[in-house]
Amino acid sequence: MLLAGNIIVILMMLFVGNIGRFNPVDYPLLANLGLGFPILLVFNFVFLVVWCFLRLRTIWFPLLGFLLCYGPIRTYSPFNIPEDKPHGAIKVLSYNVFMFSSWSEPDAKKNPIVDYIVKSKADIVCLQEAQATLDDKDHIYSTLKKHYPYFKLMIKKAPGADYMVLLSKYPVLWQDSIPYGSSSNQSVAYMLDIKGTNTLVVNNHFESNGLSSGDKEGFKTLVKGELKTGEAKRQSVHLITKLGDVSARRAPQAETVARYVKKYLDKKVPVILCGDFNDSPLSYTHRTIAKELNDCFVESGNGPGIS
């Protein structure tokens, strides 16, 4: 019975770890199963411990499971030996600043988000949801411009739409909005002259999950086990359906950006792509974008990228 359970967990790990191969447009209900991948890893580790005490010769089952899922595990939670940064490396910061939380601290000089960006000393900064006053009453943009000679703002012309900001220490030759279907989210491309090399920088804010405060509260109640069986099932179906629908809208956005980027990669133009994907590392969105690129977090980061 235990062995059968371990095999089932391993098969689920393989399926969920590769869930990004399924397009959410066709399989919306599967789109967010990747969120459960770490839970399956924990279950498999528990089996590893159990076999150590009960039947040592069976320990290779969970070990094989980890080996078969090496790719998804490394994508979700990479581990790398720390190394010195290479000569000539540049520092890039991507940050969804959520309007700089200016309602809690309207003074840019005291705003912790602005302070963090300045102190990061990043060479290139890509900001999402970077709404600030255009007349500079909050002094946010002017404060950032003091530290970055090149400032680009792209505003989507729709009520409540996104502000995308690029801060750069390198010259910005042009900026371009990457068109895809979204009422508020957007992706913006910039061509930068980085030490004499034209480099494409892409700042993304893919479709938000759009969970209401009621949805979030319902999820918390669900996790705490405070709902009756019928209500818990209804709440689960509601959340899975809603997240699946959003994933189906996000998929073609990622495909559009991937096609845009590939045009420049085919011309041997270096590409730096970052942003708020609103999705998990094992998602179709991430897989589509990363197909032609190197994931810097996987290559040099450590642990799960929790934010």
Predicted regions and their residues:
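Transmembrane alpha-helices and immediately adjacent membrane-cytoplasm interface residues
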Residues: 41-84
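Residue-level marker for buried hydrophobic side chains located in beta-strands
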Residues: 92-93, 126, 273
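Structured beta-strand-rich core segments of catalytic domains in phosphoester-bond hydrolases
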Residues: 66-87, 104, 115, 124-221
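Membrane-embedded alpha-helical segments of integral membrane proteins
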Residues: 3-55
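A solvent-exposed, charged loop/short amphipathic helix patch at secondary-structure junctions
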Residues: 216-243
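Active site of divalent-metal-dependent phosphoester/diester hydrolases
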Residues: 25-35, 150-166, 238-272, 277-307
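Active-site-proximal beta-strand elements of phosphoester/diester hydrolases
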Residues: 89-101, 198-207, 236-243
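Stable alpha-helical elements in mature extracytoplasmic
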Residues: 109-113, 136, 140, 250-257, ...
